Design a protein with these regions (language model features):
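Short, surface-exposed beta-strand/strand-loop-strand elements in extracellular ectodomains
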Residues: 89-107
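Exposed low-complexity, polar/acidic, P/S/T/G-rich flexible segments that act as propeptides
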Residues: 96-100, 141-158
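Solvent-exposed serine/threonine-rich low-complexity stretches and specific carbohydrate-binding patches
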Residues: 106-116
Length: 158
């Protein structure tokens, strides 16, 4: 090896050891799956269906486009992850909310992404600084989503 090559290798080793020696330790997030309201499994499987007219007249339309997940009252999560696994290819209309006990909600995702079957979409939302939500709402529905299937899980992360 010539002298310039040795110098270059030495500088590279010094730079690498400096970067490794001065890096901060990375602390892994720990996440816990939340239970859906009225469910007994942390993963919910749905197909977006056409809305129906309620039994007592067209006051509004019934649909199964919302899924709520329960946040335990003593939980102190830094963020919430919605993991949506499409079982169909195509465009999905997705909105996610953190719902608070004062009857307010923060929307943290409102898009119509084009998704690929079996390729998960992970959406992260952050709670208010002095409040924790009591539910995480996942809304998947709209005309563009009709007939498309998906699985959804929500995790609270510390």
């Amino acid at each position: 090896m010539n002298r310039n090559g040795l110098f270059s290798a030495t500088v590279s080793l010094i730079a690498a050891s400096f970067c490794l020696g001065n890096s901060l330790p990375v602390q892994a997030e720990t996440c816990q799956a939340l239970m859906p309201v009225g469910g007994n499994n942390t993963t919910v499987t749905k197909t977006v269906s056409q809305p129906s007219i309620p039994l007592f007249g067209p006051i509004g339309l019934n649909n199964d486009w919302n899924t709520d997940f329960i946040v335990e009252s003593n939980a102190k999560y830094k963020n919430y992850k919605v993991i949506l696994l499409p079982t169909s290819n195509g465009e999905y209309s997705i909105r996610t909310y953190l719902k608070y006990s004062d009857n307010t909600a923060d929307n943290f995702y409102d898009q119509k992404p084009s998704l690929t079957a079996n390729k998960p979409l992970v959406i992260t939302g952050f709670p208010r600084s002095q409040q924790q939500p009591y539910q995480v709402n996942v809304f998947v529905g709209d005309l563009v989503s009709l007939g498309k299937g998906y699985q959804v899980t929500v995790e609270g992360c510390r």
